[in-house]
Amino acid sequence: RFLTKQDVDAFTMAKPLFMPRADGVSALVNSAALRLAGITKATPDPEGGRFDRNEDGEPTGYVLGNAMKPFRTILPDDTDDYLKDNLIQGLKANAAMGWTQTQDAGMSYRLVDLLKTIHQEGRMTHRVYVAVPVSEAMERFKRGREKTDDDFLDVRGIKVFIDGTLGSRGAALIDNYADSDHNGFMGRTPKSTLMPILHQALTDGVQIETHVIGDRAVRSLLDWYDEAFNATSR
């Protein structure tokens, strides 16, 4: 089963808890976090996400997809120094394992700019290939592809999320999950948001990387791709 607020409230009463799952598309929050974010029984599920609820309709503290956004917005912001140090430590750890290149699908431009500084300081230990999140797609079109002469940093693509994951019961299926009363969710990136980005990406030659797992989500996305290809002259 998935953890709920009842599993953690007893020892986290004084502090809000936001604990993302390893897949990054679901999280556990405690009662303090629910109160701070203003999430109640009456709060509707957002497009592209859902609040898991008990039989009485109360949020259990397990949140998926875009239902994580209210909690992410109230998290304290990290400093640039903290983020830069984490990037440097990550680069060192990767190099120590013999990795010569990594890919980050969804790295914000804030982190990209910090990586540029690290590169200028001569502290890049391996190549990094970047796709920025779909929320920063317009900035990607504005900046264009950014690539260092030594190939250590290549900012090229745009990362899109359509549904959740099978493990979190968030991937959008045609039928309900065998152990749940729902079939997942779509809309993490709504069609109305995605189509103009697809058209621009096809026109500019920008790579699109799409997270799409469930059969219902895959069918929809392929239709959208087809629509974008047919509407865009190349």
Residue ranges and their predicted role:
Residues 7-8, 144-146, 230-231:
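Short, flexible, glycine/charge-rich loop motifs used to bind or transfer phosphoryl groups or to couple energy/partner
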Residues 147-149, 154:
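Acidic/histidine-enriched ion/cofactor-binding microenvironments in catalytic or ligand-binding pockets
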Residues 51, 146-147:
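C-terminal capping/extension segments of zinc metalloprotease domains
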Residues 120-125, 148, 228-234:
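Short helix-capping segments at alpha-helix termini
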